[in-house]
Amino acid sequence: MVRDWSACGSLLLVMTVAKDRGGPAVAGSGGGVESPELRAAYEVCEAEARQFAVELWAAAETLPVETRPSLYAIASWSAYTDRIIDEGPLEGREERLAQWSADTLADLRAGHSSHPLRRALVDTVRRWGLAEALIEEHLDSARADCAAVPVFETFKDQRRYLRGCSGALAELWVPLLEPRGPEAFRLMSVLGEACQVADLFEDLPDDLAAGRCYLPRQDLRGLGLDVDDLRRGEREEALNAFVDAQLAHWRGLLEETVLAPSTVGARYQIFVHTLLLGAQMHFDEVTLLRSRVLTQGLESLVTGDGRMSRRAARPGPGPVPGHIAVIADGNRRWAEARGLLADQGHRAGIRAVLRLVNAAQRTGIRHVTVYMFSTENWYRSQGEVAALFGAFADWFARGAQTVHELGVRVRWSGRRDRLEESLASSFELLESMTANNDKLTLTICLDYGGREELAAAARALAAEAVAGTIRPEQIGMAEVARHLYVPEMPDVDLLVRTCEQRISNFLPWHLAYAELVFDPAPWPDFDLARLRDAVDSYAGRERRFGGDAELPAQAGNLEPARNG
């Protein structure tokens, strides 16, 4: 079947606007359409997109109001095409699809249509000067998929399907997004392919049961497998290797598409970041499941009403750290290696933080602390500091509702007197909104320095001593901890630093007995597989906490004995 690639879903809502969106965005309110019939057609498209392509509908809410109706028109037409293939009696499906295709192309030639979905599509194509050949390419792919069971010998063959099914549609959108050159068209097409791979895995059990396999047969034969082995799910080692091969293909697409946000206008980059993050989150989920995905498929990361779904943890067999802290280093190097400006690296770094939150929840980690901006980072150029805080502001504006729906409690560790007032207020509002959440605690270290934190605690204790509320001999570790930025923060079990091998003035109080893992990858490349490797390394270590006993790594519930 042809699938609506927007249903790759995952975290398409991660950076969408807050829930108080206001009324519907219909062409005419921002698009200059005066015809009542055409306005009504666009309203039908939005309703259809909201019902049958909810993830894409929600992501479109990040777009300027004049752009959304056109995206709804394309999404609703594509979803309707998909439903012709998937719904209704088997007999006559090819004929119904052929008629719908012929009517669509005839309407495009005529410049008008009596069908509301096609009427809006025709107007969108003419309004933006979209390439009708891409619509024909998509319809050709749909007809081929409807006519015969798919057999893709190689990944190259599979990519031709991915291109026709989803890449062509993604490329069709590009003129809506203020493209910055021809590369935008190619990269958006690849992003469409990457999202479609996610959708293949989501529907895999149902497709296999129906005798349809969209994965390369060459990879199967190379491991001594056939399609029946995928359905049975019994040869775990070989099946894991097969899924790993698919992940390798997919990773190549994702690595290419990380450049896509930089190729569209600034107002549209959040939309592309959202789509890319959705594909990355699904990639991480398949990494977690491996061969289990063949029989279980992928859980949707959003519910039917567009809210984030809270999925159960799937910890590995070994101990899991209760608290992981991350020095997220390498955004600038990541960007430079790809010919991008530093601000694109920082926005990719924000994506990686959201990706980490999802991965930590799935692996059973309860506390995550991320070093985002140090007291020393103020010495960077004004332009880079502004870019960093612009990325933070986007995160607060787009991600607050999502992390709240995931049950994440967000806290701020750092100085609160030097940030721009609106940014500080946004962070404090997010803290308040998520204060009662208990699925995971995410602490963001912003304008944080470890020595400054300890000095501030010392100043507060000195003031208490001068006021006579505490005597110097009464000051112990508990009293110091009471005056840290986040007094209730537990000790760190595992510290991960990307790119470099330094602690960089990070959490000196909490790192006293932490295990350290240094990952050479730049922060935007940190995914679930790298987190799993770090956790596996942690699980294999003996933690003594300064004593003689050989204690295994614990899940954050062991209070080490310290000399007072």
UniProtKB/Swiss-Prot annotation:
Enzyme Commission number(s) from the entry: 2.5.1.32, 2.5.1.-
Needed cofactors, names only, are: Mg(2+)
Annotated metabolic or biological route of this protein: Carotenoid biosynthesis; phytoene biosynthesis; all-trans-phytoene from geranylgeranyl diphosphate: step 1/1
Question: What's one Pfam family the UniProt record gives for this protein?
Answer: Prenyltransf
The record's cofactor note says: Binds 2 magnesium ions per subunit.
Q: Which UniProt keywords apply?
A: Carotenoid biosynthesis, Cell cycle, Cell division, Cell shape, Cell wall biogenesis/degradation, Magnesium, Metal-binding, Multifunctional enzyme, Peptidoglycan synthesis, Plasmid, Transferase
Question: Gene Ontology terms, cellular component aspect?
Answer: cytosol; plasma membrane
Reaction(s) this enzyme catalyzes, per UniProt: 2 (2E,6E,10E)-geranylgeranyl diphosphate = 15-cis-phytoene + 2 diphosphate
Source organism, top-level taxon: Bacteria
Q: Which GO terms describe its molecular function?
A: ditrans,polycis-undecaprenyl-diphosphate synthase [(2E,6E)-farnesyl-diphosphate specific] activity; magnesium ion binding; manganese ion binding; Z-farnesyl diphosphate synthase activity
User: Subunit structure, per the record?
Assistant: Homodimer.
What's its job?
Catalyzes the reaction from prephytoene diphosphate to phytoene.
Concerning its family, UniProt says: In the N-terminal section; belongs to the phytoene/squalene synthase family. In the C-terminal section; belongs to the UPP synthase family.
UniProt protein name: Bifunctional protein CrtB/UppS
